[in-house]
Amino acid sequence: MPAPILPLIEAAAHWPARGALLGLDLGTKTIGVAVSDPDRKLATGIETVARTAFTADAKRVLALAAERSACGFVLGLPLNMDGSEGPRAQSTRAFARNFARLTELPIGLWDERLSTAAVERALIANDVSRAKRAKIIDEHAAIYILQGALDRLVALNRAG
């Protein structure tokens, strides 16, 4: 059975109370990958996967999930500023549908508007060269996306 693909809050109900999550930032040329600690407090970058073909890309991401005993995924969904879904969001959803056929781990979608821009500003502010930024931007965006999702889940647990 394919993995469920749900908004973050709904996906969280399908994840066990404890266990690492993998955060993914889909770029056109790379996939940034981050992982949380089992208590879901902190996101850390682990790899930038160079995109080649879907099967190879998915195989690498699934291997990273297995290596870290992940129990689910947080996939950044690049919405337009007005909240609508454009071509990039549609492409991300297509990736999620195909990826879900290869795993049973629930996939949570998280609004990633401006994540790459925010990360790029931070890297520029820290004098990271353009060449170095190009190599690490998607991994850092994955950290940003996953940490935002983790923080949202903590806030909901405190409120709820």
Curated annotation (Swiss-Prot):
An example molecular function term from Gene Ontology annotations: nuclease activity
Pfam families this protein is in? RuvX
Major location (coarse)? cytoplasm
Would you indicate the residue range of the signal peptide? Answer: none
List the GO cellular component terms: cytosol
EC number(s) stated in the UniProt entry for this protein: 3.1.-.-
Protein's GO biological process: rRNA 5'-end processing
Q: Has keyword Nuclease?
A: yes
Look up keyword Cell membrane and say if it applies. no
| Biological function | Could be a nuclease involved in processing of the 5'-end of pre-16S rRNA.
The protein, known as: Putative pre-16S rRNA nuclease
